[in-house]
Amino acid sequence: MAVGKNKRLSKGKKGLKKKTDTFAKKDWYNIKAPGTFAVRDVGKTLVNRTTGLKNANDALKGRIFEVSLADLQKDEDHAFRKVKLRVDEVQGKNCLTNFHGLDFTSDKLRSLVRKWQTLIEANVVVKTTDDYLLRLFCIAFTKRRPNQVKKTTYAQSSQIRAIRKKMVEIMARDASSCTLAQLTQKLIPEVIGREIEKATQGIYPLQNVHVRKVKLLKAPKFDLGALLGLHGESSQDDSGQKVEREFKETVLEQV
């Protein structure tokens, strides 16, 4: 008889692992947009429950969500723009967010670029009155003059430089003279783009002038009172302030 363990006799039943539902340890939280947008209730996010030293609120703070502006404004004309919202505070089951940036969809940007015209881009770093440091990117395209027969609409280098200078001046002036919330209200109806188009009419006619991207470089020290004021001091209200598309700002004649 062979010396050693009899494998067949010592073999017992396999211990089956108990299946645990991972979602049982998680909670859903509501994402609330600032009052500058028409729709306040953005969606929901999932996070692990508070256990021991791990706090659920700490895991939620700093999360960034990308939302279509069409959903926030209930207007399909804004579908090509995406807004980034950052969670700054958690109250109960509600995540209070603040504006973190803006961008265009890649398909919209590609659809704007065409033959026989000049693309002009400019960017500027500005600080709002409430100490948010932002970088704004602007894009514009030349268009035909009235009664123009020539197919191409190429601008000269001197004209491009002059247009770019106007872009930087207008973006810097408009952004540095208002708060982040007020700047958001200007960006939604594209006030800055129309202002640039009007100011550069004498240099070269432009079309499709947009602030295509807003990047948040640095935020000031967190102020809970300012955030609650932005959310109307109540996270239960699902309605915000709708920014009308017809909103127009007075343009200085000297620009």
From Swiss-Prot:
The modification N-acetylalanine is found at residue 2. Component of the small ribosomal subunit. Mature ribosomes consist of a small (40S) and a large (60S) subunit. The 40S subunit contains about 33 different proteins and 1 molecule of RNA (18S). The 60S subunit contains about 49 different proteins and 3 molecules of RNA (25S, 5.8S and 5S). Pfam families: Ribosomal_S3Ae. Keywords: Acetylation, Cytoplasm, Ribonucleoprotein, Ribosomal protein. It comes from the Eukaryota. The keyword Protease does not apply. One of its GO terms (biological process) is translation. One of its GO terms (molecular function) is structural constituent of ribosome. InterPro entries: Ribosomal_eS1, Ribosomal_eS1_CS, Ribosomal_eS1_euk. It is found in: Cytoplasm. Its main location: cytoplasm. Belongs to the eukaryotic ribosomal protein eS1 family. GO terms for cellular component: cytosolic small ribosomal subunit. PROSITE patterns: RIBOSOMAL_S3AE. It comes from Pyrenophora tritici-repentis (strain Pt-1C-BFP). This is Small ribosomal subunit protein eS1. The keyword Transferase does not apply.
